[in-house]
A protein has these predicted regions:
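Positively charged
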Residues: 1-156
Length: 156
């Protein structure tokens, strides 16, 4: 496993559409392992392959001790709406309020090509939606309602 360099929002590569994964092999497994290590090193909760310079529809998400790898993720259903503060490992020094589904159902494959369906709510729904957007070249700042500015300590 290796830590990979993160592609930032000032690099036009991050806006490219990712391609479907067709080969579920050691190359993909190594990418997924590297993505997990890179995400942990950067203290993130999700990462898309495009964020480490690979145009493959592969994302990882880790929320509430649940670690997921989703290959070729496809949103089947979105229910409700929530507006929460988001950040991104590819977008430096900006956080903002983004509307996302309250519940999301996604079809994807695991690292071996086995198809599965998962439904996530709350923070998991946000994370899945955010990472799937990356596969389409969309960043959270494209959907941001307004920037989040934390209050400074000692201010009322």
């Amino acid at each position: 496993m290796a830590i990979r360099n993160i592609v930032y929002s000032d690099n036009e590569f991050i806006r490219k559409q990712s391609k479907k994964v067709v080969n579920f092999n050691e190359s993909l497994w190594e990418l997924l392992d590297d993505m997990k290590e890179t995400m942990h090193k950067a203290n993130g909760c999700g990462l898309a392959a495009v964020q480490v310079g690979v145009l493959k529809q592969a994302i990882i998400v880790e929320v509430n001790n649940l670690f997921l790898e989703l290959i070729n993720p496809e949103i089947l259903e979105e229910i409700g709406e929530q507006c929460e503060v988001e950040g991104c490992l590819s977008v430096k020094n900006i956080s903002g309020y983004v509307k996302r589904p309250k519940q999301i159902t996604v079809k994807a494959c695991d690292r071996y090509g086995n198809e599965f369906v998962i439904t996530g709510t709350g923070y998991l729904a946000c994370a899945l939606s955010h990472e799937i957007d990356h596969t389409k070249g969309i960043l959270f700042i494209d959907k941001m309602e307004r920037e989040y500015k934390p209050k400074k300590k000692g201010s009322n």
